[in-house]
């Protein structure tokens, strides 16, 4: 717990010094998720996406965050947009991870539709 708080403080300070640093926002958002601060993490991920739509890693993590908060359509949109960007950038591994996430969310919600 203390280690996570220390990371949070260091990353927050880095972001204060460089408020437009997409990596700092992304890294801080990941640590905020670990600290159960999903709303703050979502705001940072969305800021990265708005400022730097080519930042490929944000699509998977923001999609997962949307899933956890029952924003299924937003999650689908993130995964789909991420897949398109990964194709454009020839990032096969990331594309595959996003496709798996999209397939899982579609299967989970198809199961819910039949209940």
Regions found by a protein language model. Give the residues of each.
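Alpha-helical linker/edge segments of TPR/alpha-solenoid repeat scaffolds
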Residues: 73-77, 101-115
